[in-house]
């Protein structure tokens, strides 16, 4: 490699985007060109951000690492999406992550933008040892109640795994019907990498499904509101009545049925 003084700013930038040596970084720091100084400042800011992110991901693996040390190889995180909406199913997902993965930005799905969730959704499916999605339909929610329907969706997700889980980490709940060692963690989607991954799979899977249901029932705006009781959704309920995918046991829907 030619000396840095003979390199253009573009050439220096290309080297910094690889894995520059300490010698090269020192040479950049000593170069008086403003463009090089800006590049080296940006390089160290990005390096520090990557370090902080690596430490955050490491903290998210605290539960998993302890379980791995205790001999549990396949740890399945479980979470749900859609307990609160007035329409559509409640969807659960389960995900078994490998010990080494590359999922920058992995977090509770509620803390991510839609575009970031979509990106991680694909990355998780590519890198996971195993994953599966389960759901409970509106009629099941009405017949059981939302809590029991959520547990049913979670159970179906676990049963859909092609890889047998040795331990379950579940967001906030426990599933006594599954005879698998397990632990419920309050705010688990913000504390466990496996649960965070499951939360993204559940959220994006449900969002995609609501987009498809919007094509069947376009008058309710499901692609936008995902079934939640927005002002526009409530107005559509009053105008068009209750659809086959509305949860009849939920108060705003029940009120509309009572009017009819």
Swiss-Prot record:
It is found in: Cytoplasm. One of its GO terms (biological process) is DNA replication, removal of RNA primer. The keyword Nuclease applies. Its EC number is 3.1.26.4. Keywords: Cytoplasm, Endonuclease, Hydrolase, Manganese, Metal-binding, Nuclease. Its cofactor is Mn(2+); Mg(2+). PROSITE patterns: RNASE_H_2. Manganese or magnesium. Binds 1 divalent metal ion per monomer in the absence of substrate. May bind a second metal ion after substrate binding. It is an enzyme of class 3 (hydrolase). PANTHER family: RIBONUCLEASE H2 SUBUNIT A, RIBONUCLEASE HII. Endonuclease that specifically degrades the RNA of RNA-DNA hybrids. This is Ribonuclease HII.
